[in-house]
């Protein structure tokens, strides 16, 4: 079975419910293929705390993601993170810190990262990415 890790921007689009392409891809791969990581969950929580709607309303919108498997930034991911950063930094092509952590989690677990941030994340070697907003 194909396993995917949802990036924060994809989770936000799922909550908004405005992207037919994302809904279609979820139906195609099945809910069992979806996962998030601790870094994505943290970013979603920050968004809930900063939301103009208020934390409680926004938290109620994102809580469904806790039903998905959630992968931590563990020792294996840390090794991948170190390799990613040490590859990108000398090239002057660093991407965001949390993006590198999310990429490391996906790569360390051989997951496809579903993101709309393909411009930056395509710089990460051996990271499989898909943009379901463009499907």
Give the ranges of each region predicted by the language model.
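Short, well-structured N-terminal submotif of metal-dependent ribonuclease cores
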Residues: 1-36, 46-63, 90, 135
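Acidic, PIN/NYN-like endoribonuclease modules and their adjacent C-terminal/linker elements
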Residues: 1-3, 103, 107-135
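Active-site neighborhoods of divalent-metal-dependent phosphate/nucleic-acid chemistry enzymes
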Residues: 2, 46, 68-114
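Generic structural signal for small/hydrophobic residues in well-ordered secondary structure
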Residues: 7-8, 22, 44, 81, ...
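Alpha-helix capping/helix-boundary segments
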Residues: 10-11, 40, 77, 119-120
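Residue-level recognition of specific faces of alpha-helices
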Residues: 25, 80, 87, 120-123
């Amino acid at each position: 079975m194909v396993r995917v890790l949802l990036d924060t921007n994809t989770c936000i689009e799922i909550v908004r419910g405005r992207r037919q392409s994302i809904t279609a891809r979820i139906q195609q791969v099945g809910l069992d293929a979806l996962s998030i990581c601790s870094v994505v969950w943290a970013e979603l929580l920050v968004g809930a705390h900063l939301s103009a709607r208020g934390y409680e309303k926004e938290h109620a919108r994102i809580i469904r993601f806790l039903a998905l498997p959630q992968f931590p930034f563990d020792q294996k991911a840390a090794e991948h993170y170190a390799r990613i950063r040490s590859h990108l930094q000398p090239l002057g092509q660093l991407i965001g810190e949390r993006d590198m952590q999310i990429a490391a989690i996906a790569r360390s677990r051989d997951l496809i990262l579903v993101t709309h941030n393909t411009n930056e994340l395509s710089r990460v070697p051996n990271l499989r990415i898909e943009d379901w907003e463009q499907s």
